[in-house]
Amino acid sequence: MGSIYRSEHMKLCQIFFQSESAYQCVAELGELGMAQFIDLNEEQNAYTRKFVNEVRRCDEMERKINFVEDEITKDLVPIPDYDEHIPAPQPKHMGEMEANLEKLEEELVQINKNCKVLKNNHVQLLEMKAVLEHVTSLLDPHSKREAAMSISEAARGEAGPISFGMKDEFDKPVKDEKELKFVTGVVKRSKAIAFERFLWRLSRAKVFAKFIQIQEQTELFSNEFEDKCVFILFFSGEQLRAKVKKICDGFQAKCYTVPENPAERTKLLLNIKVQTTDMKAVIEKTLDYRSKCIHAAATNLRKWGIMLLKLKSIFHTLNMFSVDVTQKCLIAECWVPEADIGQVKNSLHMGTIHSGSTVPAILNEMETDKYPPTYFKLNKFTQGFQNIVDAYGIANYREVNPAPWTIISFPFLFAVMFGDAGHGIIMLIAASAFVIFEKKLISMKIKDEIFNTFFGGRYVVLLMGMFAIYTGFIYNDFYSKSVNIFGSSWVNPYNQTLLANMDAQGADSNTDLSLTFPPEIAFNHDYGPYPFGVDPVWNLAINRLNFLNPMKMKTSILLGISQMAFGIMLSLMNHIGNRSVVDIVFVFIPQCLFLGCIFVYLCLQVLMKWIFFYVKPAYIFGRLYPGSNCAPSLLIGLINMFMVKSRDASFAHDVGTAAGKEWVIVNGQNVTYTINDQCYLQQWYPNQSLVELILLLIAVVSVPVMLLVKPFYIRWRHSRGLHIDLGHGPDEHGEFNFGDIMVHQAIHTIEFVLGCVSHTASYLRLWALSLAHAQLSDVLWTMVLRMSLTMGGWGGSAAITILFYFIFSILSVCILILMEGLSAFLHAIRLHWVEFQSKFYGGTGIQFEPFCFTKIIRVYEGLDQ
C-alpha cells in the first residue's frame, strides 16, 4: 500500500540538451510519461519562442487534416482507429508530411469544385430537358388564346383574379395572339403560388402564367430533393420582359430560352439528352475517384493525426525550454518521481543515441522550495477509487491519501443504504461482465461518456455489488422478502385450538386479529439468536419497522462515529509526517478527547444497551433492572448529560425490602422493589452523573485548547525568526499576519466542534436511505408481482410472465438499481468528502501532469477529457 498511501517523492530536475538531440530526447520522455516540464518562458508570448515556426507548420497541417476529416464525415465513411504504436516522426520528415497533406487537400478541393460545376450543369440540362418536354403542351393554340384573352381584360381594366378553364366563347375583344411574348423556365413548387401572385399584382394581370410539375428528379447526385415546376409566362412588349426576368431572379427561378419552332425544339431536346447522359457518366466517374481518395485518406487519417499530435506536442514542449547564449544548448526543468529518475535517465540516453549526437543529455537534481505536484502510482483497480477522492480535491504533497480506505468504506456505506441481496446480485453480474470483457471493450474504444463513466468505475461497482449482497443478507432482504436459511429463533407459544377459534372469530366479525409473541416464552433461548443477520420472522411482523428502524438508526450512528474517529486517527499520520508536535499535542489530542467524551461515549452506551438490557429482569452493574420498560433512553440521557440534570441513582428503590410494591423473579428468586418515576431516564451504572460531568468538562476544555494554543505557538516561533509551516499547501505566500492565523484556526475549531454534531446526524442518511430502498422494493413487490401470483389458471401464468419479465424486471432495474443506486452512490460520496475526509484531508494539492503521449492520444481519440 506504500505508494498509494502517500504520494510519491518528487524531485525537481534540470536537464541540459544539445540542440540536435533535444527533439529525440523529449520524444523518448513522452513515450515514458514520467516528466512534468515547467514553462521557463512564461514572460514570452507564443510568437517569440524558438520553435514558433514549427508549431505554425503543425497548425497548418492540423487544419488540413481537419478538412480531410470533414470531407470523410460528410460522405459517411467510417474512420478506423489505429492501434499500432507510432514513433514520433523526425523533424526532417515534416516537409514530406506537409507535401502529402497539401497534395491531398488540393486534390479534394479541385474535385469538389469540379463536382459542383458538373452537378450544376447536369441539373440545368435536366431542367432544360423538362422544359422542352412540357413546353409543347404549354404553347398550344388554346393556351395562347387563353393568355391573350386574360391580358386583353387586364388592358381594359376588367381583369379579376387569374382563373383557369375559361370558356372558348368570349364576346369581348382580344389582343392578337401573334403579339404575345413568352418566357419559360423552372421554379420550385413551394414558391410557385407566391411567384404567380407576385407576377399578377406587379404586372396588373398583364402576365399570364401556367405551371406543370416535373415528375422526373432533376438533382440525381444530391440527397436533398425538392419538387419543381415548369412555367411559361405570356406577356406583351419587351419592356415587360425585363420586369418578368427580374421577378424570376428574385424567386430563384431559372429561365431557359426555347425556340418557337417545334422542329428546332425537337432537335435541341435530342442534343440535350445526349449531353445529359455524357454528363452523368462524367460525374459518376468523378465521384468514384473522389470516393477512392476519401477511403484511402480515411484508412490513414488516425495515423496522420497521431503523428502530427506527437510532432506538435514535442515542439510545444521544446518551447518551454530556455536557450543559452550560444543557441546550442536547451535547458529544461521538470518534476520527476524520485523512484523513476533512473528510467528518465535511460530515456535521455536512448534519445541521444537515436539522434546520433555524441553529447549526452545531462540531468541534475535540484534543491528547491517550490511546492511539488502530487502523484500516486495506480492500477486499473485503484484508479476508480482515486478518481472519487480527486473529484473532491487533489491531495497535498505527501498527505495521507483517503483512497486506500475508500476502497473498503465507500462500497460498504453504499451497501448499508442499498442493502438488498437480489439487487446486489444484478449489480455484481453487470460489473463482472465489464471486468471479464474489459480487454475487448477497451479495444472497441467506445466514446460514449455515460458508458465510459460506468466502465471506468467497473471495479467500484463490482465491490458495491458484493457489499450489497453482504448487507442484504445482514438485513435478510432479498427483493423485499426474507430467506429462512438457518431456521427462526422464534416459536409459536399458542396452541392450535386457540388459533383456530380466533381465526373463526375474525372471519365472523370480518376483522384481522393479531397476536403478540412474548419474548420470554416465544424466543428460543436454547437456540439463541439467528446465526447471521435479521431473523426472517420479522418480515411477517406488524411491528417490523418498529424493530428495524431503531436497529438501523443506532447502527448508522456507530458506523458514522467510527469513521469520523478513524479520520481523526489518520490526521495523526499527517502531523507525524509534517513533524508538527504542536498539532499532535494541542490539536489531535483535544479533538480525540472532544469526540471521545461525547460521541464515542454515546456509541459505548448503544453497545451496552444492546448487550445488557434485555426483556428479562436482571442485576446489571449491581443494580436491579426490572424489565424492558426501564431500558435507558439514550437520546434524552445525552440531553440530560449536557444539562447536568440530577437523576436517581438506579431504576428502583426499596429493592429486596418489605417496602417494595412490586416484585420480579431474578435468577429464580423473588425480588421486591418500588420503581422510580421515569425509570428509563435514571442512572444505569454507578456514578454515572459524575462520569458524565467529567467527560463534559474535558470536552469543553478541549475547545479553547484547539482554538488558542497553536496560533500563539506560531506567533512565538515567528517572533524568534523560526520557520513557520501554516499548512496552506501551494498557496502559502505573503507576510505573517497573526489575525489571519487566528481566524483560520477559529474556523477550523468551530467547523470541527459543530461538525461532530452535524456529521453524526448526517450519518443517519444510512438509515433513511436503507428504509426508503426497502419500502420501495416492498411496494414494487406488492403492487406488481404479488397481483400476478394471486391469479390462477392460464391467466395467472400469462400475468406472471408479462408482469415479471416486462414490468417487475424493468422497474427493478430502472428504479431500484439505477435510480436508488445513484442516490446511494451520491450520498456515500458526500459522507466520504464531508464527514470523513474533512477530519484529515486538505485536498489543495497540484496534480502531477507529465508529458505523456498515451494521455495526449486518448484525449485526441475522445476517450479522456
Swiss-Prot record:
Glycans are attached at N578, N670, N687. This is V-type proton ATPase 116 kDa subunit a 3. It comes from Caenorhabditis elegans. GO terms for cellular component: apical part of cell; apical plasma membrane; plasma membrane; vacuolar proton-transporting V-type ATPase complex; vacuolar proton-transporting V-type ATPase, V0 domain. It is found in: Apical cell membrane. Keywords: Cell membrane, Coiled coil, Glycoprotein, Hydrogen ion transport, Ion transport, Membrane, Transmembrane, Transmembrane helix, Transport. The gene is vha-6. Residues 1-409, 475-556, 605-623, 710-798 are cytoplasmic. V-ATPase is a heteromultimeric enzyme made up of two complexes: the ATP-hydrolytic V1 complex and the proton translocation V0 complex. The V1 complex consists of three catalytic AB heterodimers that form a heterohexamer, three peripheral stalks each consisting of EG heterodimers, one central rotor including subunits D and F, and the regulatory subunits C and H. The proton translocation complex V0 consists of the proton transport subunit a, a ring of proteolipid subunits c9c'', rotary subunit d, subunits e and f, and the accessory subunits vah-19/Ac45 and vah-20/PRR. It comes from the Eukaryota.
